[in-house]
């Protein structure tokens, strides 16, 4: 399931390519035909992410809410203008392990990025230039990959829909196809406010002391295990399985500890670390959770998922700190990774 950093990055692409433009909506699959009819032909005025959900506003006052869930993903095609943080980072755009095309070039400041490529061991390329728009196809979900369009799609725009496309958004130059979401619906402003009110704070949107205090107060009231609370989107927005495991290890917190047993200071530090890791994820496209790496180790970590986490998917392997074997168990029907010694 895409975690919060991915949804923020997708939203930035909508902000760069759709906001301020008239958008045509259709539902090639047919399931969203009525919703598409309500929005088509209107100007997109805002693109906003809250945790794992995205909200796109149109000039008729209606919003499109999308939650990708476990299997949802966006495919972009056309003359795409890459968001600067995506283009200049070691991020990837896509859900599959397709080999990308390295895009050598410059960033917005004119810096040559052609020598900075870091190839992922799964065959995914980094994205290295924003420059002039390129005719590309981009798939954005939990992991990110860029590939140049091949075959007829190089010369044909918009491309023919492929698979079960719930909704297509189309401008004169860019299209975005949504497949497999958990939620795709049209909301009015009151309904959007109601959904957002149910969501916990997201440090990418609100890093104020008030947001931090809201998180602390919510957790301190609950007897629920902290490993469950971090996955509860009404407590804090955007955290998924990877970030849960890594945040708890970095804080040396037992995932079974009741929320109300944790001190204010511990929870404040946890919130601030989440803000720190989320910012890294948004800016790089990677759930990089290891700090203070030298250049060699950093490049290895960007290439290989196994080298960028403390405990996630390291069950049975020795803890990087104490040597105890990492434990895997289920919590809330999701896999939980932790060190039984460091997090005792």
Where are the regions a protein language model picked out?
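Structured catalytic/nucleic-acid-binding cores of DNA maintenance enzymes
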Residues: 1-344
